[in-house]
Amino acid sequence: MINITKPLTPKSISQQKQQQQHPYKNISTTKSNNNPQASGSKSFVQEKYPSQLYESEIKIHNQSLAEYDLDIYDIMVNLIETNKPNLSLYKQQPYLTFTIRLKLIDFLLKMSIRLKILPFVFFKAVKIFDRYCSKRIVLLDQSQLIITTCLWIASKVMGGNNHFVNINNLDKIGHENFRTINDLGYGCGGKYLGPTERFRLPKLHELVKLCGAKCKYDQGMFKQMEVHVLNTLEWSLNDPSIEEFIIDSHEFNVININNNNEYEQTITTNDESANANANDGNEFFKIKEFLSYAALYSHDLIDTNIIELGQVIMDLINETFQLQPFDKHYQTILNCDSDHPIRFDMQRYKHIKKAVIKSVLNASDFMMKVFHSKGPQFIYQQFNLQYKLNYTTNSIIGGFGNSGYSPTTTTTTTTSDNISTTPTSSTGSTTPVSSYIGYANSRSSSVSSTSSVASSSNANTPSSSCSTTSTTPLGMTPHKRQKNYSNYSNYSNYSNSSTSLGLTNNNNNNTTISPVDSTTINSHTKNSSQLNYQYHNGGSNNNNHHHHHKPSLSVSIPPPQMHSHHHSSTVYQMVTPPNSANKNSNKSNSANNNNTTTIATTTTTTTNNNNNSQLPAPHQLSYNNYFNSPNMQPPPPMKYTPGRKQQQQQNQGQNQQQPLQLYQGDNNNNGTNTNSKFNSIAGSRAVSSSSSSAVSIASSISTNNYDKYDDDDDDDNSNDLFSSSRRFMNYSNYSSSTINGSVMSGVINNNSGNGKGNGNGGSGTPISENDSPIYTKTRLCNMIH
């Protein structure tokens, strides 16, 4: 039996020289472990791997494989086709959707960075996971366990130059024969720096910890899942990965890397061009790694041949940097030349290229932070500038670090089908792309399989949903769109903007406004999506509004009725231009009375047709503020029968009768003049469509005044009180009966202060515009839905 406690091999010459130079290395590891001060005083320096030896090894390797290169290539292609995931079977997963898959991939990327996994091990792990998902049903509670186990398997299969000793087995193998991490700073056999990067395999307790306590995984579950995954894949893990076709050996060489002084630079010459070439080679490596990782996020590329994917990545790099075959950094597949090109169908080529571009444009925040170097940032910006998206160059330039950029941006709606694989020139008044680097961390981590519309929201509202469509470009991030509108006198300068953010245009030309809570809007800031509507008169009799006649949207958008800003002075700003909103109150009241008399004679058919067309958006309402709007029509009377109302008010105390008397008193003040106007225009039906729609908006909104009289019904019939369907159905009857005062006549006559109400008098007339009720968000939402 071999005595493993003795040294297996004699010390090499370099070890003897190093021991002579550093005599303190003779100290035993046992003493160093017992004496932490002695171990802390040691200093170990890794030797650089000889570059001459590296070049010689590469030369001999190429000569050995030159005779069998075609056979090896055929075997690799066969393995790729055999171990390719099946997308049709992947789509039959009952629980694992593509959205969940993308979240799992994002989680695995974070874990690989946390564990300092070597490059492209993450790519191999995702491919193993896709193969497993093509053969087994994945439960959601086991999804993290499966994909983490795939990372563990991939790190074992292609872990690279791993010479670290498992510290848990030191007692069995003899700790005196090996230099461990504790006393050397690097693993056994790691005395050389290079030629490739070394790393430590992830331990099970680290995987359990990184998955989180909520998952409740243990080390035994990882071991069982590892065997289960290997049995499912039939232990076939030797299929090549993408780095074997797009990465050269010298790009894996860490000796010449100058990445933030992480490794010492071995270039001793003072030639700056040599340093630049070394840095450029590292940047091209990062670009290929970035494009490969981004392609994993596209479900369209799950079953794509990795050789074809690598060819598309190489072509994208050559197109972006305009590299020619005679250039030093020209990218090819497996050293192929014009005699043996990679050939495949052009339609599939365009499909792969389009999917890769979409994946890059939808890169998450975390990925852009990982690939923060100049190369990936540059190619990301070039993709935004070159390929045809539905935004102009001015919108991109205006979004970069310019708080006062021009607001005349065009439509920023971007769809996934509008990406052309033909690059367009980025000439014109554009900023240098190098100045854009540093703004790439503003991407959303959200991925979905459907096309979305880039909508402007509050700057503090993160978009957490997932999307595989082309999202807002880097220069059009939401926090770059906010403008200061505290000075409302400059409103006319911004009203000509043609931004269509916050709107969703459906196929039937119906336009909806994206709901934004009014409480999230700053008191000194207006979102551009709330200002740049195309207003139109539509034959309205209200001439107090000044409209800007510059159409900017293809769909005619009705003007919102109300909007509020929470100013300390309680001065409310209308959505309409402030020139009309700040008119004298006396003039507006007189105009309102004229509008009220005209609107009251509208027919039932006109009112019902426009009920749902111009409802204000939820973000245009306030929670507890009063409005004195010239566009408001008094609300309809209460829909309860006089007999029920009389019985309810008889059971109530004096505190419930007093508000009703105030309500009656206000109506008595305005009753006479209003009824005389009603009688003068009773036969007139010539009312404009915009006026009738204003009736439907104001009449369909329930008010807080109803709560004052119906508090006893909140327990049993609260749904009836706030029901929008019954209010819409019964408003036509109320509008006709309100003119004659027949609906509320019994209630008013029995509860008025002087008891002089009559059936045709002014006692049943609704309140005037100056006594506008409170608009609540809850009731409006109930009406809309």
Curated annotation (Swiss-Prot):
Residues 22-42, 513-535, 621-631, 765-774 have a biased composition (Polar residues). It comes from the Eukaryota. SUPFAM superfamilies: Cyclin-like (SSF47954). Residues 71-238 form the Cyclin N-terminal domain. Residues 754-764 have a biased composition (Gly residues). GO terms for biological process: cell division; cellular response to neutral pH; development of symbiont in host; filamentous growth; filamentous growth of a population of unicellular organisms; filamentous growth of a population of unicellular organisms in response to biotic stimulus; filamentous growth of a population of unicellular organisms in response to neutral pH; positive regulation of filamentous growth. Residues 1-42, 408-433, 447-679, 750-774 are annotated as: Disordered. Residues 447-473, 484-512, 579-613, 646-679 have a biased composition (Low complexity). Keywords: Cell cycle, Cell division, Cyclin, Virulence. Pfam families: Cyclin_N. SMART domains: CYCLIN (SM00385). Interacts with CDC28. Belongs to the cyclin family. This is Hypha-specific G1 cyclin-related protein 1. It comes from Candida albicans (strain SC5314 / ATCC MYA-2876).
